[in-house]
Amino acid sequence: MPAIASKQYSDDVSLLVLLLDTNPLFWSTTSITFSQFLSHVLAFLNAVLGLNQLNQVVVIATGYSSCDYIYDSSLTSNHGNFESNGTGMPAIFGSLLKKLEEFVTKDEELSKEEVSEDRIPSCLLSGSLSMALCYIQRVFRSGHLHPQPRILCLQGSPDGPEQYVAVMNSIFSAQRLMVPIDSCYIGVQNSAFLQQASYITGGVHHTPKQLDGLFQYLTTIFATDLHSRGFVQLPKPIGVDFRASCFCHKKTIDMGYICSVCLSIFCEHHKKCSTCGSVFGQSKLDDASSASDKKRKAPST
């Protein structure tokens, strides 16, 4: 009786889940247009699919108020057809461009009433990370040959402190699944979320200095499969921003108060934890601190 083929990983076969930032409020303030950015991204995806015929690419659009799957190479009937369709783009990305246009239009309609003009809002990173992990989990449970999965976040929108808990949950889930999260941040200010995601999961974080050469950055840094990364020199983080967001006002803080029961973080002292309901004994702490102050101030005889 023949042995049943066991599920195993392939060294040089990659499953790349790309999280594409489509926040229109961010792209209206950049030096590079979204169409130019998209041309770099599609050329990069074309290169990834060309490196190995078994490679898979999934693209998730990350909008302001929603996120959705817009491309899956495993479902494309003309996978491997790299001829141009007359628009300068490979023919395999025809469905991607169509679904992306529909998604952007729908996302703009949903976000009209929620947009504030005082700052650029964040994109729904927590939702797209969750969708990426769900897709990877489905791949793990189907088929006999699993490609090496990884997530690449292409983001320019600033971090949303209100998404802190959901984003961190996704990061630790990816760490448990041994799925690295690569990040390429093209915004003005660096992203603490993406820095922590790449650091915790063993991915690569990079901020391109020249967006005109984005394709070169993507191909030289992020096109490398996980097996080959041990033989190439990739950018290493100089410093990681580990600041957290408070649960009360949803803002990034350097120092704060932590509930010893549920580990919720607050920027100001509260008598009661709003998450688990634990009562903080600040009065005892005040008495202890005042007693220690009196001991320090006691005159020497």
Curated annotation (Swiss-Prot):
<keyword id="KW-0234">DNA repair</keyword>
<keyword id="KW-0227">DNA damage</keyword>
<comment type="subunit">
    <text>Component of the 7-subunit TFIIH core complex composed of XPB, XPD, TFB1/GTF2H1, GTF2H2/P44, TFB4/GTF2H3, TFB2/GTF2H4 and TFB5/GTF2H5, which is active in NER. The core complex associates with the 3-subunit CDK-activating kinase (CAK) module composed of CYCH1/cyclin H1, CDKD and MAT1/At4g30820 to form the 10-subunit holoenzyme (holo-TFIIH) active in transcription.</text>
</comment>
<keyword id="KW-0863">Zinc-finger</keyword>
<comment type="function">
    <text>Component of the general transcription and DNA repair factor IIH (TFIIH) core complex, which is involved in general and transcription-coupled nucleotide excision repair (NER) of damaged DNA and, when complexed to CAK, in RNA transcription by RNA polymerase II. In NER, TFIIH acts by opening DNA around the lesion to allow the excision of the damaged oligonucleotide and its replacement by a new DNA fragment. In transcription, TFIIH has an essential role in transcription initiation.</text>
</comment>
<dbReference type="Pfam" id="PF03850">
    <property type="entry name" value="Tfb4"/>
</dbReference>
<dbReference type="InterPro" id="IPR036465">
    <property type="entry name" value="vWFA_dom_sf"/>
</dbReference>
<keyword id="KW-0805">Transcription regulation</keyword>
<keyword id="KW-0804">Transcription</keyword>
<keyword id="KW-0539">Nucleus</keyword>
<comment type="similarity">
    <text>Belongs to the TFB4 family.</text>
</comment>
<dbReference type="GO" id="GO:0008270">
    <property type="term" value="F:zinc ion binding"/>
</dbReference>
<protein>
    <recommendedName>
        <fullName>General transcription and DNA repair factor IIH subunit TFB4</fullName>
    </recommendedName>
</protein>
<keyword id="KW-0862">Zinc</keyword>
<dbReference type="GO" id="GO:0006289">
    <property type="term" value="P:nucleotide-excision repair"/>
</dbReference>
<dbReference type="GO" id="GO:0006355">
    <property type="term" value="P:regulation of DNA-templated transcription"/>
</dbReference>
<keyword id="KW-0479">Metal-binding</keyword>
<dbReference type="GO" id="GO:0000439">
    <property type="term" value="C:transcription factor TFIIH core complex"/>
</dbReference>
<dbReference type="InterPro" id="IPR004600">
    <property type="entry name" value="TFIIH_Tfb4/GTF2H3"/>
</dbReference>
<feature type="zinc finger region" description="C4-type">
    <location>
        <begin position="259"/>
        <end position="276"/>
    </location>
</feature>
